[in-house]
Amino acid sequence: VDSAAAVASFAPGTHGEPFTVEALLQNCDDTEMGPSCTFYAEGARWVASFGYKSNDAALEYMKTLPVNAPMIVSGDQISMGDITVEAAVSKAEPGQRDAYADQRDAMQGDWVDESDAKSTLRVVGSEETASYDGQQTAVSVLGFADACPGGDSIGPVVWKQEMGGDPMDTPCFALLAVSPTRMELSYVGRGNTLVYVRP
C-alpha cells in the first residue's frame, strides 16, 4: 500500500460533511462522473472521482483491491442523491471482513430462479441485476444485516434497494441457506421462499 493512501490529504470538513465509514469496494472504472472508484457503506453507493478533491493515492490503492474488499475510508461528503454520495476521499486503508463476508462471497455471480428459468440474478459486489427472459428489470443495492430495516433481529438477512426506486422500499429476505451452488431466501412479511441455483 502506498503510504500516502492512508495519510489524510485534507482537513475534515474542507469539502463538506466529514465521514469515516467501513466500506466495501465495488470497482474503479469510468462512471457518469469520469474515472472514479465506487464503494458501498451504510446502505449507500459512494463515488469518488480521480483528480477531483480526493486523495488520488487512496483511489489508486482502491484500484488494486478485489471486489468486496473491506476498507476504512475517510473524507467529506460533497453531495448526496437518493442513494449515491459524491465523496471526496481523504484516506483509505484496509478494513476487517464483516460478519456477512462469507454469505456475500457465496452470493457472487449468476443465479437462476429454480421455479422459473427465465428469472435470473447477477450479483457483483454489492449490486444485484435482475433480469427476465434476458431483459434487465432492476439493479439493486444489497445490504446485509441481522434485522430488516425497522424490524426485529432474526439472524442474517439481505435487503434490496432498487436504484432509481423509492428509497423507503427495501424488500428484505431472510438468508435461509447460501452455498456456492444454491441460495434460499425467505421474503420477510410475505413468507414465500425463493430458491436460486447456478445456471
Residue ranges and their predicted role:
Residues 56-73:
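Short nucleic-acid-contacting surface segments enriched for D/E, G, S/T with interspersed K/R
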Residues 2-40:
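Structural detector for short beta-strands of small beta-barrel domains
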Residues 84-105, 186-199:
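Edge beta-strand at a domain terminus
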Residues 1-8, 69-71, 75:
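A general sequence property marking short-to-moderate contiguous segments
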Residues 76-81:
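Short, charged beta-turn/beta-strand-edge "cap" motif at the junction between a beta-strand
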Residues 16-20, 32-34, 68-70, 106, ...:
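Extracytoplasmic
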Residues 14-16, 62-64, 92-112:
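N-terminal helix-cap/turn-to-beta initiation motif at the start of protein domains
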